[in-house]
Amino acid sequence: MASSPVAPVVLVILDGWGYREETYGNAIASAYTPVIDSLWQAYPHTLIHTSGKAVGLPKGQMGNSEVGHLNIGAGRIVPQELVRISDAVEEGSLFSNPVLVRLCQTVKERNGKLHFIGLCSAGGVHSHIDHLYGLVELAKRHGLPACIHVITDGRDTPPRDAAGVLEELEQRLKTSGCGRIVTVSGRYYAMDRDRRWERTEAAYRVMTSNEHIQPLRAVDVARQSYAQDIGDEFIVPTRIAAGAVEPGDGVVFFNFRPDRARQLTQAFIDPNFSGFERALITPLDFVTFTQYDASFNCGVAFPPQNLSHILGEVIAEHGLKQLRAAETEKYAHVTYFFNGGLEEPFPGEDRILIPSPMVTTYDQAPAMSALAVTQAVKKAIEKQEYALVVVNFANSDMVGHTGKLAATIQAIETVDRCVGVLVEAATKVGGTLLITADHGNAEYMIDEDGNPWTAHTTNPVPFILVEGEKRKVPGHGGHVILRKDGCLADIAPTILEILELPQPLEMTGRSLIVSAPYEMRLNRTPVSLKI
């Protein structure tokens, strides 16, 4: 490791900070953001794509934090699990998947039941309802009773979307003649990722007990919740029919995104589980759609795709130090997802985890832990040890998901101030900053009907290059512009160019930096900026 002072490249990821011209319902346009506004005016900037085919998703599919960080860290467009699994359903290879076939055979030999647990929506961020329909057909082909444990969305979809989804699901099950909905739980409970075990427990108890059955249709559970002003995300776990997870059964958790599926999975499979009191259900065959954690002892229907020569790996191979920093809500994204699904850090990779505030929803604490993250990263920059610093600010995404416009504006203004601190710290040591986002959210919070919008968007995001005195852009100096057709996969090649490191062949992204035309250089006026 180099001992001389290092001028870092600082990648600042403003989670959920999209770009949209329209100001109505736009928390970012409504907020007071003097730092970002000044940087946008003074430095090379562009808009980049973060959704659909630009990040390996189907055309028109909104991006998300997992996909965003995966593409940024990989330096290439990574085909996403949504596409991979959807293709398996459409082409029929799902029905010959060896892990799923073996599960069905084992359950049938035991005269057990097959359970499908997952987020039931077309959001495409954590799961897709079409994948459940494929699983129901799988159960039908094997002559197995299928018990469906619905997790309702309301976060990656409109807050009251579940009623329509459940109506269609009930009709599809009736037509199929296979499968029944036995429990309904909001994702707030079943998909917690912050070790609020009381939430996970509420969903787990309903799924594993036939007590307290409320003889309702699933759609009626949603409608009764709406009548109490409870949206899909917060539907209280409810059992509506017999069909608890019991010894001899098999389970498929069909979420493909790992982070919010881990806690509930642990409760089912971990013999040393300590989140809450429960007896381990055994024998129980448990399959997850993707690998939720390398340490989990369960089947995986779609094993991970290996990515080689990603950004963190290249930095480490050249003997340089790097730092990843975020609060709890986005820590996995700057580490696990940024590193292509690897849990272990690369040599020379340090990590800073700042706990997120323990509140029910983040509109109650719009600043979240941004100030603490900022101070920790500022100190790290001042050490001049790291060639690359990656920091994520969760506020505009996490508060944006609440649908509370005023709170989201506060969140954005907090982040703007934090960016100012990091710009000052980085430029003081000659470092260069790249300021961008992983997907849109907070720029669109009210839909065309005037209702709160809590999901992500397909809008582009800003990308700003703040060039430092000791970390100049090679061969260009101040005479640079940024391409207009870029995407998240282009960020890693841009960083490598600034660090003067070779771009591996596996990295198919292209640097966003291009030389400005001669005429533009002549007309460019130097800007004096003080933050």
UniProtKB/Swiss-Prot annotation:
Q: What is its EC number?
A: 5.4.2.12
What keywords tag this UniProt record? Glycolysis, Isomerase, Manganese, Metal-binding
Record: residues binding substrate:
126, 155-156, 187, 193, 257-260, 330
Name the cofactor(s) required for activity, per the record.
Mn(2+)
Pathway noted in the entry: Carbohydrate degradation; glycolysis; pyruvate from D-glyceraldehyde 3-phosphate: step 3/5
Q: In which residues is Mn(2+) 2 bound? A: 15, 65, 438-439
Question: Which GO molecular-function terms appear in the entry?
Answer: manganese ion binding; phosphoglycerate mutase activity
GO CC annotation: cytosol
**CDD domains cross-referenced by the UniProt entry:** iPGM
Q: Which residues bind Mn(2+) 1?
A: 397, 401, 456
How the cofactor is bound: the record states: Binds 2 manganese ions per subunit.
What SUPFAM superfamilies has UniProt attached to this entry?
2,3-Bisphosphoglycerate-independent phosphoglycerate mutase, substrate-binding domain (SSF64158), Alkaline phosphatase-like (SSF53649)
Q: Which domain of life is it from?
A: Bacteria
Q: Which residues form the active site?
A: 65
- Pfam families, per the entry: iPGM_N (PF06415), Metalloenzyme (PF01676)
* Catalytic reaction(s) noted: (2R)-2-phosphoglycerate = (2R)-3-phosphoglycerate
| Claim: Ligase is one of the keywords in the record | no
Describe the family membership recorded for this protein in Swiss-Prot or TrEMBL: Belongs to the BPG-independent phosphoglycerate mutase family.
Subunit description:
Monomer.
What the entry lists under PANTHER family is as follows:
2,3-BISPHOSPHOGLYCERATE-INDEPENDENT PHOSPHOGLYCERATE MUTASE (PTHR31637:SF0)
Under what name is this protein listed? Answer: 2,3-bisphosphoglycerate-independent phosphoglycerate mutase
Q: What is the lineage of its organism?
A: Bacteria, Bacillati, Cyanobacteriota, Cyanophyceae, Acaryochloridales
Tell me the gene name: gpmI
